[in-house]
UniProtKB/Swiss-Prot annotation:
Annotated organism of origin: Haemophilus influenzae (strain PittEE)
Enzyme Commission number, as recorded: 2.7.1.11
Protein name: ATP-dependent 6-phosphofructokinase
Name of one Pfam family that matches: PFK
Taxonomy of the source species: Bacteria, Pseudomonadati, Pseudomonadota, Gammaproteobacteria, Pasteurellales
Subcellular location: Cytoplasm
Amino acid sequence: MIKKIAVLTSGGDAPGMNAAIRGVVRSALAEGLEVFGIYDGYQGLYNNKIKQLNRYSVSDVINRGGTFLGSARFPEFKDPNIRAKCAEILRSHGIDALVVIGGDGSYMGAKLLTEEHSFPCVGLPGTIDNDVAGTDYTIGYQTALQTAVDAIDRLRDTSSSHQRISIVEIMGRHCSDLTISAGIAGGCEYIVASEIEFNREELIQQIERSIIRGKRHAIIAITELLTDVHSLAKEIEARVGHETRATVLGHIQRGGSPCAFDRILASRMGAYAVDLLLQGKGGYCVGIQNEQLVHHDIIDAINNMQRVFKADWLKVAKRLE
């Protein structure tokens, strides 16, 4: 029977992480467990940055963006000797189990601790990219989506005033959920997803045809890493004769107070993680599917479950262009 658990946040921050930490801490305390916070992710674990938390440690954090525990990327965790030391540090504090909040890289760390050192870990999906398998939504995605839509709305105001074409680069790495959803909600004329081969010439020809039909401005939503959006803007302007500007939303998408959906999702997932650990279930990750909380083997989430590309959503977006 576990008596002490720890929680850490790892990788890129996401709105709602604080709500998830709060969900873990208060649920665990309600079950009579002691809770420890690990500061700065796996790097902080390696450096023994561990502090006991109480219910007041998570007061007034549910509405705050980021993560008060801090986060850091720690590639050294790939070293089995580093992982062995981390497991030793956890046990030196009497900690019996660990909740890890982050993306697929964070899950891998939890998987290895569970496999190599029989240390029970549960993963919560915390990333704005919505690219974690085994869940319909990740913590932070809905807030980042609203941030992107707000930016698109503002760009449309100025683009329509100046007959300008605006390119908006949206985060997501190799998952275009944010781009497609923001593109539909923002009424973007063109959506360029990473899951489909990008054809610059085809895009420019589409814009040219729109201008011939009398289109005075346009918004192009494009997933990051596909192309240099500033060079694309110059090429479009040279070809179609309309002023074209590129806006990279960047890390602004990660910040801000989490929306109600993310606060509730994170709170529920945090409590569910504690329930799993109390049942002796380590090596799992939590998700939400069809409005129900679920858990999967963390190895499956990393290796076997493929994210479903929103091809039908993109088809709808194309019809609305």
